[in-house]
């Protein structure tokens, strides 16, 4: 003969039912994340290197970038000269907007060797400190001062950032030409 469920058994059965329903709702919400951009954070100098290494996988063969050369080279000594050459070997062309600083001018002078086209903008007005690279369906941000790397993977966001870059490029080219006039 089966025994009657005890009050504690009923309580535990009820709790299991409630928790299983909550778990099912949480699992459903996780499934919906697929429609959202994937965002990855990387900390420290290693994290910054990680996001730059990811840019070397650009399938489109193109990167557009806004960056401060001074901050890049100060944050990670001896990394970028080799990175530039690996990007070139991988056939990934870069168009970049640099602040008009001594290092920006130096890097612009190395455009051909580093498989890049760059323009300079007045650093007092348009100087930035992080690097922002856009490639494929990714937006990469490297904050050298905060020691943080971020990759946002979203076709929609990357497309918008590429269009914003194109608009900035037109203005930056005009500023670059103006600074080179006698």
Predicted regions and their residues:
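PLD/PLD-like phosphodiesterase catalytic module centered on the HKD motif
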Residues: 78-182
């Amino acid at each position: 003969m089966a025994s009657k469920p005890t009050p504690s058994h009923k309580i535990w059965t009820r709790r299991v039912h409630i928790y299983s329903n909550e778990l099912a709702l949480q699992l459903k919400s996780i499934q919906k994340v697929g429609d959202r951009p994937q965002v990855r954070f990387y900390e420290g100098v290693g994290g910054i290197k990680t996001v730059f290494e990811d840019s070397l996988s650009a399938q489109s063969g193109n990167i557009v970038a806004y960056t401060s050369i001074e901050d890049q080279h100060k944050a990670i000594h001896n990394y970028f000269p080799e990175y530039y050459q690996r990007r070139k070997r991988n056939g990934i062309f870069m168009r970049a907007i640099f602040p008009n600083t001594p290092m920006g001018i130096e890097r612009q002078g190395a455009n051909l060797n580093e498989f890049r086209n760059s323009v300079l903008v007045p650093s007092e007005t348009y100087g930035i400190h992080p690097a922002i690279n856009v490639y494929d369906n990714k937006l990469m941000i490297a904050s050298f001062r905060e020691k943080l790397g971020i990759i946002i993977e979203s076709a929609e966001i990357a497309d918008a950032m590429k269009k914003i870059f194109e608009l900035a490029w037109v203005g930056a080219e005009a500023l670059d030409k103006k600074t080179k006039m006698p």
